[in-house]
Design a protein with these regions (language model features):
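Short, P/G- and charge-enriched loop/turn segments at secondary-structure junctions
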Residues: 1-2, 11, 115
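A sequence-level detector of short, solvent-exposed, charge-rich linear segments
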Residues: 58, 91, 95, 130-134, ...
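Cysteine/selenocysteine-centered motifs that mediate thiol-based redox chemistry or coordinate metal-sulfur cofactors
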Residues: 6-45, 135-164
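A short, polar/charged loop-to-alpha-helix boundary motif
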Residues: 1-6, 122-140
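CN hydrolase (nitrilase-like) catalytic-core segments centered on the catalytic cysteine
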Residues: 21, 27-125
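Active-site beta-strand termini and strand-to-loop segments that position acidic
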Residues: 15-18, 109-110, 130
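Short solvent-exposed loop/turn micro-motifs enriched in small/polar/acidic residues
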Residues: 5-8, 98-100
Length: 164
């Protein structure tokens, strides 16, 4: 992604909508658990991840679709929050290379169960019903935000995780 776009500088935002408070992480953001946690801490009730992911031009035999779904499901379970992950389908043909996008958009409930999933080959609209009150209650009971050890996390701010 950094080869095609300039990184944003607005931080991670949460928006109030008529349905829920939503946090949106786009494309490459989806691979960083810190992004999901920040949006959840800011009050997001649903995480949205619009993306365009598929085969890697350098290794077109590698299918990362299961790994992609597991990463998003992990964000859902770790933050006890529903996730909506949308992905494009089809092939993008460039002058020198092409890239296949594998679809498989999905929705999870707040414990990481997939409640809706699209296929790889055709456009689909997914609908899923989630219970935001149950999600909030579970977060309060489990205390995953309350019990964090923030005094031990400063190493996350260093690229190599070093203590110095």
């Amino acid at each position: 992604e950094k080869f095609y776009f300039n990184p944003g500088d607005t931080g991670f935002k949460v928006w109030d909508t008529a349905y829920a408070k939503i946090g949106i992480g786009i494309c490459w953001d989806q691979w960083f658990p810190e992004v999901a946690r920040i949006m959840a801490l800011k009050g997001a009730e649903v995480l949205l991840y619009p993306t365009a992911i598929g085969g890697e031009p350098e290794d077109d035999g590698f299918d990362s679709s299961d790994m992609w779904q597991r990463a998003m499901i992990g964000h859902s379970a770790a933050n006890q929050i529903p996730v909506v992950a949308s992905n494009r389908i089809g092939t993008e043909q460039g002058e020198e290379i092409s890239n296949y996008f594998y679809g498989r958009s999905f929705i999870t409930n707040h414990v990481g169960d997939k409640i809706a999933e699209a296929g790889r080959e055709k456009e689909e609209v997914l609908i899923g019903k989630v219970n935001l009150d149950e999600a909030e209650n579970l977060r309060n009971v489990w205390g995953v935000f309350r019990d964090r050890r923030t005094d031990l996390y400063s190493d996350l701010l260093k690229l190599d995780g070093s203590e110095n």
